[in-house]
Amino acid sequence: MTSLELSALAPSEQHFLASKLLSDYVECIDDDRLEEWPDLFVDDCVYQVIARENADRGLPTSAMFCDSRGMLRDRIVALRHANIYAKHYYRHVLSNVNVKGVQDGELLVQSNYVVFQTLVEGDTQIFNAGKYIDRMVATPDGLRLKSKRVVFDTYRIPNLLVTPL
């Protein structure tokens, strides 16, 4: 699959491919297969988690920012071996996957998400909610994320943001 092929695909095919990549993305996180998570990005990717209030005002301050797949891998290594945090599990719910079009060989996609967090004590709460703004590109391995901007509506994060959203 090449970037030129993305614009040639029917909207239903674009939607299917985008939805599949998003499903793979949240499954890696929810099933704690975090070492596989960076493989869903291209090498020169951008991953940003930013509060809606900052995004709306054009402010650059992010809760998390990585500008390469190597940084994503480093984040997972730190999570597994250096960070100390309460054991928890995520469960994502995605909705309204909307392919906005193809621009410069990139599939522009927006979707909504809610993340439920369950702590080892068994309590489950809504941890975070917002939208994904994605730029996806075709690679020999299939569709991959060139850019993922996670814009969260949640006013505050109730505890440490360790695991990717």
Residue ranges and their predicted role:
Residues 1-31, 39-43, 50:
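Short, low-complexity N-terminal intrinsically disordered segments enriched in polar/charged residues
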Residues 8, 12, 16, 59-66, ...:
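Charge-dense, low-complexity intrinsically disordered segments
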Residues 43-112:
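A solvent-exposed, acidic/Ser-Thr-rich amphipathic alpha-helical stretch
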